[in-house]
């Protein structure tokens, strides 16, 4: 069994090691109203990292269903305390799209399958959604105490597997920086805007994101929005999955 978190605790922002990575902060603009939109489902094969309805996200006022989050909500993050959601989006995938595009099938993570009784309930994620893994093996094998691993690279047995679905809605949200948030008891990522992930959006949707985050229109701006942790490849992740 892969144990995603040996410590199994929520780290307080005051004790976070904020010096280990100096992430540039995008200055908040005035466009903080909710932006909920249906995204392009089939522009590129890579799947945008997303949650699914029913996932509970830890916020400043307790757990909130991800589908109820709106821009302006305050969410608990691992590194930077409680942060404000700047953007939310959704991608609806019906059964026809799912049938002809198996790479879009959600990954089911069974309750307790990741060690320490985590996640707290059955959790479904998009294949590319990255989960935080922090245990002795990550430190020994990769010289990193904490790493991110795509859900599709955690597949093993019946506990973590790709499932057939008649359709789903993929939901995601974004902060001023890439954050790690608490979802059904496990730490996983917020939306990370990269060249690849932004290709999953139509022109109008990208324009709305760029209105909130104008720096992301340039390659340098996207590069400055760095990932919160190192991401393991499929081969690297296989070393952690029994």
Predicted segments, located by residue:
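Sequence-level preference for short, compositionally simple segments enriched
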Residues: 1-51, 59, 64, 163-242
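Long beta-strand-rich cores associated with HINT superfamily self-processing modules
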Residues: 52-59, 76-205
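A sequence-level detector of short linear motifs
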Residues: 65-66, 84
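Structural motif
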Residues: 67-74
